Structure formats: structure tokens, C-alpha cells
């Protein structure tokens, strides 16, 4: 009888090139995405050793971290940022890699561009020098971030040295109630298992609540798997997956597509296959979630209160909570809905897709951004921007008093002009709330797009269900 295998096992086994006695593996990489921050030294290493990019057709380059989201005719003002983008373009040209320029409508955040272009396909291995590469796992691919030296290795050989991971399944049952989105589900998961809960694992997301998510929602969930410490996150492909991929520029066409779908339908976990760890969550019990502290595991319900260190017996945890409260400028026991906001950011590889902007627009429609709030709405790609404008979403945002920007990573991280000032507090749809993540001294609360829009309207963290 054939061994029962998980989805991860099937993809891993199909890509094994070699296994060493100590268990170290060499795996084949199907797709490689590169951006301006982690690729310069990798290309430089190739040049110094006289190597070529082994498979330029399997590599896609796009600048996203450093690009401005305001007037692009002025170029990039910060010299270091400008040099990184110029270097990526020069390297792509030199090594024959397709590069999506800033003036290309396809340009955007790397993890939004890949799926849009049909570069992301089920059953493939996908890497990028970026921690949120797990996003692509929503398509039933094995996708994970790698370091700069590994970027060079993949460019040169189209392979990667890896140790196999353990299997974890997170089953999300039930139907989410009003105001509860994919972002709330993944925040609740991280709040439950912690930022080290997934360490050493590849996580498969399963269950009714995951199946019911759109592809955009599944990407949001897989995107934040890394925040639970996991190597990657993935969802078995289904008819929603195939429909999303069909007709994309780089996806198979005609008979090749039908053949691909036949293979993709084999990409599921065999019934009875072994998982090293199992976690369950009932989505029907959730309300909208927020983070209160400086770690993605610092999650509470919007109806809840900020924790009180006095209630925590473990000294290390108590001190961590005290430090977070101090940095965040919060008092123990205060209501989540009493936390005032200065800036709202809707965008990023977590929530920068058309579905996210539709959800935000529903809240903004007929309302005004609070006078005390700056609201930045940043589409994840030029194609998302175009579609949002065709649907008139940009007009809703602008009429509400929000800023409709050009695509890029923007305020997700302090690598471009969009940054929090010291002491400013944001409601952000991004993925990390570390100290200084959005700017030195900035304070970040992670929320869904609808919750971010609600905060923009009221000037404080607000239960979107009340609007």
C-alpha cells in the first residue's frame, strides 16, 4: 500500500533532486521572484564568479519596497533606495530576466504581481528573498522566503539546499460572522499558537472557513503564516484556484491548461495522512481582531481590553507585556475601542488586492475621514489600481478624504517615504507590528481593511459591525 502523504509531502517529493545521509535535501525550484532589496549582492556574486542565471524565464523581477506611492515623475528621492531600484533594472537587463518597471501597469508588490501574472501555479516550488513569500501557498504551491546567498544559489542553479519541515494542519471550522474576514481569522490563529507556534513546520490550512474564502482571502491567511514562525503555509487547490489562474498571462493555455488542472486535482492531503501537529479554530466564535502590542501574537478582540501585566504570573511574559504597553503608550485594561488613531494604512502584500479595497470602500462610502486622521490607500499593483478605478472605488476614497496612491509596499515597512512619525499610531492592514516597523517610534495596530476604514472614519479603533 502506498504511503499516505500530505499536500506538502507530495510537492516536496516531486521536487527532490538529492538527499544526503544527514537528511539535507536539494530541491528543484520552479519559480523565483526577485525585488530590489535582497537581490543586488546575489547578482553581484553571479557576475564575480562568471555565472549566468540558469533559467531567466523562470525568474521575475519587480521593484516594490523602495518605490514612491506619490508623484512618480519626480523619481525616487532617497539615494540608497534609488540605487537599489536602478541596480535591479540593470541586473535584470544584464542577465535576461523580465523586469516590471515602475511605469509598467503590471508593477506592484511582488506577492500580488506573481499570482496576477499566472507566475504562481499549484504544485510548484516558489522562492523569493522576502519573508512573506508564503502568500503564494494559497494556490497549493510550496512557497517560502530565502536569504540573499540562497537567492544567488537559485539564480545560478535553479535549486536550493533545504532540510525537510514537519507537517502541521490548522483546521478552521464554522462560518465567520459579520465583520470577520480572512485577516481576522489569521490574527486569531497567531494569537492562539503564538509567533513560535509554527516553528519548524509547513502549515496546511483546511476546513470549511478556509474553503469558503476567496483566493484573495486565502492569500491573506498564507501571507501571515510566517508571523506564526512557520516555514510556509498552503491551501489545497480547488475550482476557485483554477478559475483564478485561467487566462492569466503566464498560465498554461488550451489543452495545456486542461492537462495542468488534471495534475492540480491530485494535489490534496490523502485521507489519514500523518500530521506532526494539529490545531483547530472555530471561525463562528470570532469577532473582528486587532493587535494591541509589538508582536503579531499580541491579539485581542475589538470588544476586549488591553492585558494587565499584574494578571500574568510568568515573569518573562509579564515584562514583555510591560515593555509593549510602554512602547505602545497604552494603559493596562483600557478598552480596545478607546485607542485613538493618527494614521490609517490600507494596502501591502497582506491586504492590497481588489477584494480588500471593495471592503474598505463599503465603509468609506458616504462618510468622511476624521479630521485627526491621515488615511493612505495603496493598491498592491497597477492592475489592482486600474480595476479599483474602473469600479469607482478611488472616487469613494477621495470623496471621503483619503489619499489614493500609486502601487508599492508603502507604509508596511519604513523603507520608503511613507512612514509614521515618532509617537504616531496607525491602524494598518499590513503584517507586522514590531517596534519601528512603520517608522522610528511608530505604533502599529494590525487590522482588516474594513476595520482600518472604520478607524479612519471614527479616529479610533472601532468595531466595524457598529457602523
Curated annotation (Swiss-Prot):
Q: What does this protein do?
A: Catalyzes the isomerization between 2-isopropylmalate and 3-isopropylmalate, via the formation of 2-isopropylmaleate.
Family according to the record: Belongs to the aconitase/IPM isomerase family. LeuC type 1 subfamily.
What keyword terms does UniProt attach to this protein? 4Fe-4S, Amino-acid biosynthesis, Branched-chain amino acid biosynthesis, Iron, Iron-sulfur, Leucine biosynthesis, Lyase, Metal-binding
The free-text note explaining how the cofactor binds reads: Binds 1 [4Fe-4S] cluster per subunit.
List the cofactors: [4Fe-4S] cluster
Assembly mode: Heterodimer of LeuC and LeuD.
Recorded metabolic or biological pathway in which this protein acts: Amino-acid biosynthesis; L-leucine biosynthesis; L-leucine from 3-methyl-2-oxobutanoate: step 2/4
Entry protein name: 3-isopropylmalate dehydratase large subunit
SS bond list: none
NCBIfam families listed in its UniProt record: leuC (TIGR00170), PRK05478.1 (NF004016), PRK12466.1 (NF009116)
This chain's source organism reads Paramagnetospirillum magneticum (strain ATCC 700264 / AMB-1)
Q: What is the enzyme's main class?
A: lyase
Per the UniProt entry, the Enzyme Commission number(s) are: 4.2.1.33
- PANTHER family named among the record's database cross-references: 3-ISOPROPYLMALATE DEHYDRATASE (PTHR43822:SF9), HOMOACONITASE, MITOCHONDRIAL-RELATED (PTHR43822)
